Amino acid sequence: MTASDWAGFFADEASLDREAYLFLDYYLECSGDPELAAAHFCSEQSTAQWRRVGSDEDLRPRFGARVVDLQILDGARPEFSYGVGSGSDAPVTACRLRIAHPHGNFGPRLPNLLSAICGEGTFFSPGAPIVKLLDIEFPESYLACFQGPQFGVAGLRERLQVHDRPIFFGVIKPNIGLPPEAFSELGHESWLGGLDIAKDDEMLADTDWCPLDRRAELLGEARRRAEAATGVPKIYLANITDEVDRLVELHDRAVERGANALLINAMPTGLSAVRMLRKHAQVPLMAHFPFIAPFARLERFGVHTRVFTKLQRLAGYDVIIMPGFGPRMHMTDDEVRACATACLEPMGPIKPSLPVPGGSDWAGTLRPLYEKLGTVDFGFVPGRGVFGHPMGPRAGAASIRQAWEAIVAGETLEERAKRHPELSAAIAAFGKPAHGQAASPQPSEQASEPDAAGGDS
């Protein structure tokens, strides 16, 4: 590629028709001239050959991806990150790259979108073996082609009649191994204690020892009994993650028998499959995060979790569970917040999804989570924090509600626990408050090279 060729892959962002492009932010490590590497990067993911032999045509103005910003983060790295790449004595340059990609190249189709922005041309571009997609921005014209969430945050709140606090979920545990009868009794107890939503674990499938039909039937009956006893709506969230050709059938069977929300693991099942199901769905859909960490965890390679969050929202998920705060989940606070923001921020006609940061939560982690997010528009999803409570799941759920009441009343957890044995038992079992707040492991804030806002994934 000559210097004159490079120019066709660079543009002033202000001069472009923003409705015709997606804007993509990448972290890139390259050898040699970073401008040449950036030009190759755009060429490979769009018009790798922009004219026919013997022709003076130029396909780049309409079809070429363009570099609109190139920032050098480190111009003299001794080698590529993670020991990737070899065979060149040229210094390695770390860059932040912003690209405008014409969405007419692939249209409003998620498999084709991912093939362009995360495909062969992106991750096998000459001289640039280290790549991480950090963010993606969609124009209104592109978003208008998608349904997005059917219910969204407002619709879910309306179904539950919960408008001024977080929505309280619980993962029924033991999550694997129980028959439907015992499993449904645990769910019933948790609803009586104050949970809004009792859910299947993401690994609980349609098995011979706990078949979906029987599970949905018994949990549906238990849900209705709990609604009659408490006077408030409840949701049973059934996991229908399965082969794509079974999704519609499993949706119908689960909903007919009593499930009033459905869990589908986004990446194992596929975003396009979820988008298909969204067109058929009668109830809210919830995403879980299996198979995302292998793409997202490395700081300088893969795809940022914020991008996965935006794609799940686009596909039609009403609720998106994501790795939450605390060291077990290997996410910085900033990255969790970035994902929550991606659920709630304006996105054209696409409704907001409810963010649910999860991982080892109990009554004592509710206050820190609420303060870090700065909004009541989130879901709180303990597992053992409810179902491993020493007084049982009804008391475990009650301890969550009592922790929220302490926040609203301006009390410490200790003060509230003096009047509530359920909360006192939770503190004794799971941890102790510190400095007037619930104990919660705090990952250190790190400004990462590729994405100070997103942190180390």
UniProtKB/Swiss-Prot annotation:
Entry superkingdom: Bacteria
InterPro entries: RuBisCO (IPR033966), RuBisCO_lsu_C (IPR000685), RuBisCO_lsu_C_sf (IPR036376), RuBisCO_lsu_N_sf (IPR036422)
Modified residues (N6-carboxylysine): 199
GO BP annotations listed: carbon fixation
Disordered: annotated span: 426-457
Residues that bind Mg(2+): 199, 201-202
Cofactor note: Binds 1 Mg(2+) ion per subunit.
Cofactor: Mg(2+)
Keywords assigned by UniProt, alphabetized: Magnesium, Metal-binding
Protein's UniProt keywords contain Transmembrane: no
Single annotated GO MF: magnesium ion binding
Annotated Pfam families: RuBisCO_large (PF00016)
Family membership: Belongs to the RuBisCO large chain family. Type IV subfamily.
Function: May be involved in sulfur metabolism and oxidative stress response. Does not show RuBisCO activity.
UniProt protein name: Ribulose bisphosphate carboxylase-like protein
Organism: Allochromatium vinosum (strain ATCC 17899 / DSM 180 / NBRC 103801 / NCIMB 10441 / D)
Lineage: Bacteria, Pseudomonadati, Pseudomonadota, Gammaproteobacteria, Chromatiales
